[in-house]
Amino acid sequence: MSNDAVLDRLGTGLRVLELDPITYRPHPIHNHDRIWTETNCYVDLWIEVLHSLGADPTPALAFVLSAGCDGRQWDFVKIMPEDLRTLYGIDVAEMNVWRPVLEHVVEGLDDGIHVTVEVDGFWLPDTAGTSYRNQHTKTTIVPNLVNREDKVMGYFHNRGYFDLTGADFDGIFNLAPEPHAEVLLPYVEQIRVDSAVLDAGFGDRDLDVARAHLARRAPGNPVDALARRIVADIPLVQTAGPDAFHLWSFGLLRQFGATAELAANYVEYLDGRGAPGAAAAAPHFRDAASGAKAVQFRMARAARGRDVVLDEPLIEMSKNWAAAMDLVAGAVGT
């Protein structure tokens, strides 16, 4: 599609990147043939933002090496601000929201600066079939285009780039028919990019980042703590019902499974970046991700009140994670 056609459809507005939702192609990490199609709104969002800035997001997945379980949940993994700064010259900092959010977004776009914004998924059409016009949920987006006159916004969310219009525009920015006073101010971050650092590349800093995450991982195998929590929660899941199950599974199985699958991508990257042998960990990470999916299916039966036995898949998840981490540590060093 030509730039003129994009402008005709989306309007002129303010934008940082020339993107069109119709022709946008997500990063290969977000192909549909994955075991876990999504991680969480923040990780998936940053993969696409980095991809659209012309950078490879894979080095920023180093957080998988320090991810763990505190006995209550698997880490809500995030691409770390310090890694964004080290690898890409990108500084991410919380904004003081003292004006209507739309004003901050527009001012940022006018200055060539993106922001992350917490919004209500109820107004995001890309979530059709889940939260869109059905359920109020917190999620994070990065607006890239705003046309205030025509009420159009182009935005990054989860695994892609989308647009919304009309009543959804009003809803996202709490505009119509008038602002609701009880709506809390969202968490907003400014994304400042040092183009010189981004364009120059990161040299061997990606390996330094990998070693730093390995060095600060908790002792022991975090999957053992995860397994204990899952087993302890079986009675809760059996009585709480399907809706509660989805929330429970997100914080334990989806976060772990997606972390393991991203780790497979990451170690394959490391293997070609001066850590030969790291790719040998990828099959173990993918088996761990598949194991988490199998446990999720069994726990879905528990959510319908059935008895489940999880010993075998949980043991295999733990073994695969341990084997993978040993291989990575040996290849990368600390």
Feature locations, PLM:
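Active-site-adjacent substructure of cysteine-protease-like catalytic cores
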Residues: 33-39, 44-69, 98-150, 155
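A structured, charge-rich N-terminal accessory region that forms the first stable segment of a protein
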Residues: 6-99
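Type-3 copper protein
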Residues: 1-2
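Generic structural hydrophobic/aromatic packing signal, biased to beta-strands
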Residues: 49, 94, 105, 117-119, ...
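Noncatalytic regulatory segments and standalone regulatory/sensor domains
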Residues: 148-252
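Short, highly charged low-complexity linear segments
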Residues: 66, 73-74, 104-109, 178-183, ...
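A short, terminal or domain-edge coil/loop segment
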Residues: 110-125, 168-181, 205-210, 328-333
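Charged low-complexity "KEKE/polyampholyte" interaction tracts
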Residues: 204-334
